[in-house]
C-alpha cells in the first residue's frame, strides 16, 4: 500500500511488506537497506545519528521538529554518522543555535547519509510496533524515479541484525588514550589533570560521552579494540575494566568477547562495569542469554526501577536485544527493570564489584539520573586498592 501526498516526491521508504511512504529527500542521494526503528527523544538527533549502536538501522524520529538547531562537531559521538538513514515528520528548517556549525541537510549529504521528510511518522511508528523493527529500503532521487519492485526486493533481502557482529565494523583500529572530560559551561571540554584509576575500555562501539564520563570520574582511560584478548587487557595493569555500548547481535559479538570477559573474571578480582552491549556481553559471560526484542527501546524518557533501592530513574536507551533475566545463574542479581515492559535493565555479581546496565547513564541525549553508576565504578576501584 502506497501513501503519496506529494505531486513529485523525491524520496521513498519501502517496507518489506510492500508498504510505501513517500516524502521529500534530503542528505545524500541513492538508496540503502536496514532495520527500521523509532526514537522518542525530543533532542539530540546528532548524537543519535553518530551513536555507533545504530549501525545497520534507519531511525524514525517521533518528535516532528528535527534539524532546527543544526549540528556541531562537538556533539558527535564518533567521527561520522553511523545510523543508515533518517526519517522525520517535517522537512528540517534553517538552524537557529549559537553553537551550530552546519545545517543538518548539508551534514548528512557530506557524510553520505540518506534522509526523508514529510512522512506520517505516527503511522510509521505504529507499523514498527506491529511488525517488529521491519526491514526497509530508503531511496532518495531528485528526479523522483523509483523502482518499487526492486526496493521491495531489497528490503526483503536484508538479512536483519540477528546473527550480525557489527562491533567489528565500528570499533577502533588500534588502542588510544582518552582524557577529555564532560562539557561544562563556559569552558567546554576540559582535559583531566590527575586521574586516579587506570581503566581499560573495550570499544564495541563506544560513545565519546561515555569515555568523557569515565574521565570525569577520575579514570585514566585506555581504549582497546573489540577483539582485544584478556592478555592484552591485563598488559595495561588496569584498576578496572569497562565494556562499552555497541551495535548488532550480542550473541555474535560474544563469540570473541565472552571468552575474554570470562578470563578476566576467572583470573582477577578487578571491578568490571558494562553499558548496553557491554551489559549483554557481561550477562553472556556469566551464563545468561539474550533475546531479540520486538521493536527495541530507543529514546530518552524510559523509566527504570532500581530493584534494590526502589527508586525510579528516567533513562536514555538504545537497544534491540535484551538480557533474559530468567536465564541468569545463581550469584548474579537482577538490579534494574524497565517500567515499560518489565525487561531486564541491570545486573550485578552478588559477591564482587562487577555490574552493568542496559541503559545509557551518560545520556547524551537524555536525563542525568544515572551518572552515579560511573561514581560507583570509581568507588569500587578505590575499595579494591584499599584492600591491597
Curated annotation (Swiss-Prot):
Pathway linked to the protein: Amino-acid biosynthesis; L-arginine biosynthesis; carbamoyl phosphate from bicarbonate: step 1/1; Pyrimidine metabolism; UMP biosynthesis via de novo pathway; (S)-dihydroorotate from bicarbonate: step 1/3
Domain named Glutamine amidotransferase type-1: residues: 198-387
Gene3D superfamilies: 3.40.50.880, Carbamoyl-phosphate synthase small subunit, N-terminal domain (3.50.30.20)
GO biological process annotation, one example: 'de novo' pyrimidine nucleobase biosynthetic process
Region (CPSase): 1-194
Keywords for the protein's UniProt record, in alphabetical order: Amino-acid biosynthesis, Arginine biosynthesis, ATP-binding, Glutamine amidotransferase, Ligase, Nucleotide-binding, Pyrimidine biosynthesis
Molecular function as annotated in GO: ATP binding; carbamoyl-phosphate synthase (glutamine-hydrolyzing) activity; glutaminase activity
InterPro entries reported for this sequence: Anth_synth/Amidotransfase (IPR050472), CarbamoylP_synth_ssu (IPR006274), CarbamoylP_synth_ssu_N (IPR002474), CarbP_synth_ssu_N_sf (IPR036480), Class_I_gatase-like (IPR029062), CPSase_GATase1 (IPR035686), GATASE (IPR017926)
Record bears the keyword NADP: no
Keyword ATP-binding (UniProt): yes
Catalytic activity annotation: hydrogencarbonate + L-glutamine + 2 ATP + H2O = carbamoyl phosphate + L-glutamate + 2 ADP + phosphate + 2 H(+)
E.C. number(s) listed in UniProt: 6.3.5.5
Binding site for L-glutamine: 53, 246, 248, 277, 280, 318, 320-321
Active site: residue positions: 276, 360, 362
Top enzyme class: ligase
Pfam families: CPSase_sm_chain, GATase
PANTHER family: CARBAMOYL-PHOSPHATE SYNTHASE SMALL CHAIN, MULTIFUNCTIONAL TRYPTOPHAN BIOSYNTHESIS PROTEIN-RELATED
Record text on subunit structure and interactions: Composed of two chains; the small (or glutamine) chain promotes the hydrolysis of glutamine to ammonia, which is used by the large (or ammonia) chain to synthesize carbamoyl phosphate. Tetramer of heterodimers (alpha,beta)4.
Stated role: Small subunit of the glutamine-dependent carbamoyl phosphate synthetase (CPSase). CPSase catalyzes the formation of carbamoyl phosphate from the ammonia moiety of glutamine, carbonate, and phosphate donated by ATP, constituting the first step of 2 biosynthetic pathways, one leading to arginine and/or urea and the other to pyrimidine nucleotides. The small subunit (glutamine amidotransferase) binds and cleaves glutamine to supply the large subunit with the substrate ammonia.
Family membership: Belongs to the CarA family.
Protein name, UniProt field: Carbamoyl phosphate synthase small chain
